[in-house]
Amino acid sequence: MSEIPADLYYTSEHEWVLRTGDDTVRVGITDYAQSALGDVVFVQLPDVGADVASGDAFGEVESTKSVSDLYAPVTAKVVAVNGDLEGSPELVNSDPYGEGWLVDLRVEAGTLDEALGGLLDAEGYRAVVTE
């Protein structure tokens, strides 16, 4: 069974979301997703400063098996990207909830609670991956 940390939020597209501040989150892909993808060989991320809309593709993860879109869990501005993935995309496989994070996002002030309320908790995500 894939690791599903209880302190994170999730999307049905297999992204995880960690609240990092009053209006900021860190985003990555889940253990389930990296396992299904196989060995990650390339990660395409947006530029810092880019605006992303909830549910829209913002990048790609390429593995030895396939190329998969990454979807924004919330509408926000990209405030940081994980530059380590350029030279070490395998971090997505080896540490999906840590060193393999993808982007940091900042939402409009005062909207994060509502945005996170639309995401899945660990139990909700577990139901998605066991269907």
From Swiss-Prot:
Coiled-coil intervals, chain numbering: none
Cofactor(s) the record lists: (R)-lipoate
Modified residue annotations for N6-lipoyllysine: 65
Top-rank lineage group of the source organism: Bacteria
Role played: The glycine cleavage system catalyzes the degradation of glycine. The H protein shuttles the methylamine group of glycine from the P protein to the T protein.
Description of how the protein assembles with itself and partners: The glycine cleavage system is composed of four proteins: P, T, L and H.
Name of the protein: Glycine cleavage system H protein
The organism of origin for this protein: Mycolicibacterium smegmatis (strain ATCC 700084 / mc(2)155) (Mycobacterium smegmatis)
